[in-house]
Amino acid sequence: TARYFRLVFGPGTFGLGGMSAPENGLDMSALAGLGAAMQSSLRLGDFRLSGDARIDRYEAKAGFETEPDYYALSQGVSENAGVDVAKVINLTDKMKPDGSLDWTPPKGSQWRVLRLGHSLLGTTNHPAPPEATGLEVDKFDGAAVRRYMDTYLGMYRGAAGQDMVGKKGVRALLVDSIEVGAANWTPRMVEQFKKLRGYDPTPFMPAITGTIVGSRAQSDQFLYDYRRTLADLMASEHYGVVAEVAKKQGLTVYGEALESFRPSLGDDMSMRKHNNIPMSAMWTHSRQE
């Protein structure tokens, strides 16, 4: 058990949502203000010290944030045994409607009860005028995306006329580069994970909180599969459904994706493949003398 802990704050480096460091000589002063507020202060909402072995950088591995290079995470971290996968018990059906747990743990062992929940990120679509601004749709839920698209295009038909979407009037739809940040849950996540990865994620779910399940290697493998599932759902349930709805209404689909860095989890080419015309963006900066 650890007796002493040391918290070290190092000097900050250039970074905007995972953007790579600029080449030598490039003038990035125009972008400096975008990250200034984040670099000027640090607010701690929760700070815990523990001597238990934990999954290194689990926040990034579990999709709570994004990382430019996942292969570089945890290099040199020693192996540690964790919770036996076979001893993880799903207590969901023991939860009462009022949120209390009705369960008597078996005698002779110590148990840790882990309760998982989810909430909205609060991210809104941007940039957009006030009357067209609202919460982002769940991009891992194809049914929700379909309802959103039907409502969105229905508003255009209502305003411009039923025959003004498709062959004339509004003839194309642009899906801009995705910059909504990290998200890592959807109501059908367990079901979709089983379908895409071929096994039940439930016994490994403590890993998304940093708990080592099985071993570090097993936990990292699960979290890799977890990120892959999120990426697959982003491509099929958001980009795929948007394109499907648009094309059925006679619209040409233009689309961008992740651009030059990783503002959200996803496979860039899998996301773009649904577009009639794949697009990208290019930024130029003046070179200092």
For the regions a protein language model found, what residue spans apply to each?
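Aromatic, loop-rich ligand-recognition surfaces of beta-strand-rich domains
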Residues: 1-73, 177
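Catalytic-domain carbohydrate-binding cleft regions of carbohydrate-active enzymes
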Residues: 66, 73, 77-289
